């Protein structure tokens, strides 16, 4: 299976990537800076690295069209301007629009546990991302 892995320098993706490769999947990882991603531990035949910034639509065409599944592990809490919720929504929208132009059938999104009454700014943002991603032409 051809898998797209976003948020590849994050904790969860770092744990997930070796498992995906060990299972025999072809994995394309999205990173903002290729220099920050160490590929030496992996078989180059099953791993490709592309530089993509989901806030910059001009970079999204680097994502291959022939992917079967994608992991959305992007999280923008580190914004120095404090507008991480808008950044997260824009990233999710750009991701969704690009995925709609691929053959992806399944997107896996890791959210947070939310209730409908009282949400922190962080969890409200995660819920908005889920709502944005759920509008895609794939299973979420």
Placement of each model-derived feature along the sequence:
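Conserved catalytic-site region of short-chain dehydrogenase/reductase
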Residues: 113-124
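NAD(P)H-binding glycine-rich loop region in Rossmannoid oxidoreductase-like domains
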Residues: 35-102, 114-116
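Conserved beta-loop-beta element that borders a ligand/cofactor-binding pocket
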Residues: 111, 131-140
């Amino acid at each position: 299976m051809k898998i797209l892995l976003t948020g590849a320098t994050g904790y969860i993706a770092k744990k997930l990537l070796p498992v995906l490769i060990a299972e025999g999947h072809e994995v394309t990882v999205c990173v903002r800076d290729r220099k920050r991603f160490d590929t030496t531990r992996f078989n180059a035949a099953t791993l490709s690295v592309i530089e993509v910034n989901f806030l910059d639509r001009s970079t999204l065409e680097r994502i291959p069209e022939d992917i079967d599944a994608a992991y959305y592990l992007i999280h923008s809490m580190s914004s120095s301007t404090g507008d991480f919720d808008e950044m997260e929504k824009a990233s999710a929208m750009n991701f969704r629009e690009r995925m709609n132009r691929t053959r992806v059938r399944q997107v896996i999104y890791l959210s947070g546990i939310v209730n409908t009454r009282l949400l922190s700014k962080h969890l409200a943002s995660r819920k908005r991302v889920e709502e944005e991603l759920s509008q895609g032409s794939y299973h979420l």
